[in-house]
Amino acid sequence: MKAKYILSSLLLAGCTFFSSCEDNLDISQHGVSTFENFYKTDADAEEAIIACYSNWKDTYAPAFWLKNLLSDDCYSAGESWTAASAQLLSTYTFDSDFSHIKTLYTNLYKVIYAANIVLQYVGDDSEVKLRARAEAKVFRAMSYIELISLWGTPPLVDHPLKANEYSQANGNTEALWALVNQDLTEAVNSGNLEEKTSLDNFTYRITKQFAQALLGKAYVFQKNYGAAVTVLDEVINSGKYDLYSDYENIQTTKGEANCESLFESNYVYDANNVTGIMSNMIWVYVHWRGDMLAFNEPTQIYSHGGWGFFNPTKESYDAFVEMGDTYRLNASICLLYTSDAADDTPC
C-alpha cells in the first residue's frame, strides 16, 4: 500500500511540474497587437484607414498601363524587353500570367482587405471612427468598380476572410454592383465624409462629392443613366469644383490639388524613385525616347528623355483636330516637326 501511495504522489508531482512548466512557457508576446485589442482608439482608426490610402496608390501604375494600352488611344513601340512587355497589352497578345494584370488585381484586393478590416474592427463611437468607416466603404466600392469593369465577375469579398474561405468563386455581377451602390450611398448619406469649404480649398481625404462622383460612374457602368445624371449634378451644383483653366499643367506639380481634382493620392517626393512618383512616371513612360529620334542639337531644347511606351494613335490625334480643339491637342500630344530644308534642320 505504501508503494502505491508513493507512486501516486510521484505521478501527481510530475503532472504538477510539467503543468507549471507549460504555464511558464505560455507567455504573451510583447509588442504584438491582435485584431481584437488593437482597433480601440481614434489613433488606431486613423492607422487602419491610412492602410487604404497607402494601398490605393499602388494600383495607379498597373492601371495606367492596362487602361491606356488596351484602349484605342495609344500604342506601344520600341525594342527593349520593357517595351515588348507593353506591346503585349497593346496587341492583346498577353496571357493571364502577365505581370501588370496580376499586380493590379492583387493590389485592388489589398485595398478591399484594408477596407474590410476597418469595417470589421473599427467601432462607431467617435467622429474619427465614423469617418474612417465611411472612407473605407468608398475605397471598397472604388476597388470593385475597377475590378468589375476590367474582370466582370471578380469574387465578392465583404469581410476579412478566414483560412477556410480563401478559395472564392467568381462573383455575381448584380450582387457586386449592389455592394458598390450600397457602400457609396451609405458613405454619402452618413454625413461623416469631409467636404471642401470652397472652390480653392482642397483636402487629400475622401470627400462626399468624390463618393457621389464614383456613384455616378458606377451608375453609368450599370447603364442607369438617369440616376447617374442626378447624382453627378449634385457634385456640379455643390459649387465646390470647376474645370481647371490651366489645362496643360493639369498633370504637373503646378496643377496639384486644383479645383477640378476630386481625389489625389498624397505622397512624398523621392527623386530616386521614378516609378513611385505618379506624375514623374507619366512623363517618363509617355514621352519620346531621345535616343531613337533623328534630329539635330537645336531641337534638344525640347524635353525628350522618356521611354516611349505610350504613343498616341493617329485616330486619337484626328479626334482632337476634328473637334477644332487646339489648346488641348497641343497640351496632350507632343509633335515633332521637320522642315523641307536640305539639311533637314528641325523647326
Give short role names for the model-derived ranges.
Residues 41-60, 81-151, 165-178, 184-198:
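Conserved, well-structured interaction surfaces
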Residues 22-81, 185-186, 205-339:
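An aromatic- and glycine-enriched ligand-binding surface/loop that stacks and positions planar moieties
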